[in-house]
Curated annotation (Swiss-Prot):
Name under which the protein is recorded: Dihydroorotate dehydrogenase (quinone)
Subcellular location: Cell membrane
Family of the protein in this entry: Belongs to the dihydroorotate dehydrogenase family. Type 2 subfamily.
Organism: Pseudomonas syringae pv. syringae (strain B728a)
GO biological process, one term: 'de novo' pyrimidine nucleobase biosynthetic process
PROSITE patterns in the record: DHODEHASE_1 (PS00911)
Alphabetical list of InterPro entries matching this protein: Aldolase_TIM, DHO_dehydrogenase, Dihydroorotate_DH_1_2, Dihydroorotate_DH_2, Dihydroorotate_DH_cat, Dihydroorotate_DH_CS
Annotated substrate binding sites: 65, 110-114, 171, 176, 245-246
Function: Catalyzes the conversion of dihydroorotate to orotate with quinone as electron acceptor.
Length: 343
């Protein structure tokens, strides 16, 4: 059924298709129909960050930026759902067109630019949702906030989403907000992590529960840079790392239509880069911090490869666009088939 739906949706522009799909998934969730459209994955419970996940396959941030279809995505069988990226104030993002499909490579290029309706709108939607599973909320900075003031934006968002999130992801790796990726390095990263850790402690006291913080990083780092990031995460007491966001590289899509468009590349071509980052992180973190792997999962075996590389959880986005809900169950099954010692 999804193959037919995809053929129809792919006749529309990528952003129109995205918006329509989100509307349909949201409507299906409100009516309780989405569970009928896909076979639920087997139970494969896992405990990560002190949270209990029914299975280790989640929805990556970016597909549902405003929390418009939380219940709908949950009914498709995801073990957890991450929404956002959300910013303190609503913003339109970059000019259209800003999403480009590369179907021959099972890839997508986007330069959305954190288009969203603002954190207050997202919180109201989370409050209205029926979903009571693991919900991640991904936070970022507004386009017009200077990088040197970025910490303020992250703290504003953290304050507002804390009571509503199972965990919070700090996005410092989107390539579509100027200067954002500089926050992954050196003193900028240390200052951000320190501020977040202090605020997390304050909010834990205020709300009576500790909400884990995850940092989402880019795949375009050297091994040396990745090692330094790992050290900073351990030192600051962060709870998890998500590896990875989209890449600026065009390796694997050279010469394809739209390959020269600006933006972050996701999907199959980023798989090896992302998995390499997971391996480097796993070697450096040595189990002290869980890894959530994202990037290039278009088949179940790719999810298993991420777990084998050292991840505790995986997330899908572009693969979901190309393969539909069946990829969730396929990924859970592939992970379940791994020897227990390997997962």
């Amino acid at each position: 059924m999804y193959n037919l739906a995809r053929q129809l949706l792919f006749k529309l522009s990528p952003e129109t298709s995205h918006d329509l799909s989100l509307d349909l998934i949201g409507a299906g969730g409100r009516l309780g129909l989405n569970g009928l459209l896909s076979k639920s994955p087997a139970k494969l419970p896992v405990s990560v960050m002190g949270l209990e996940f029914p299975n280790p396959v989640g929805l990556a941030a970016g597909l549902d930026k405003n929390g418009a279809a939380i219940d709908g995505f949950a009914q498709l069988g995801f073990g957890f759902v991450e929404i956002g990226t959300v910013t303190p104030r609503a913003q339109p993002g970059n000019p259209k067109p800003r999403i480009f499909r590369l179907p021959n490579a099972e890839a997508i290029i986007n330069r959305m630019g954190f288009n969203n309706l603002g954190v207050d709108n997202l919180v109201s939607r989370v409050e209205a949702a029926k979903y009571r599973g693991v919900l991640g909320i991904n936070i970022g900075k507004n386009f017009d906030t200077p990088v040197e003031r970025a910490v303020d934006d992250y703290l504003i968002c953290l304050d507002k989403v804390y009571a509503h999130a199972s965990y919070v992801t700090v996005n410092v790796s989107s390539p579509n907000t100027p200067g954002l990726r500089s926050l992954q390095f050196g003193d900028s990263l240390k200052q951000l992590l320190q501020a977040l850790s202090l605020r997390q402690q304050e909010l834990t006291q205020r709300h009576g529960r500790r909400v884990p913080l995850a940092i989402k990083i880019a795949p375009d780092m050297t091994d040396e840079e990745t090692v330094l990031v790992a050290a900073a995460l351990i030192e600051s007491g962060m709870d998890a790392v998500i590896a990875t966001n989209t890449t600026l590289s065009r390796q694997g899509v050279e010469g394809l239509p739209h390959a020269d468009q600006a933006g972050g590349l996701s999907g199959a071509p980023v798989r090896e880069k992302s998995t390499h980052i997971v391996k480097v992180l796993a070697g450096e973190l040595a189990g002290r911090l869980p890894i959530i792997a994202a990037g290039g999962i278009t088949e179940g075996r790719h999810a298993a490869e991420k777990i084998a590389a050292g991840a505790s959880l995986v997330q899908i986005y572009s693969g979901f666009i190309y393969k539909g809900p069946a990829l969730i169950r396929e990924s859970v099954d592939a992970i379940a088939a791994m020897p227990r010692a390997a997962r």
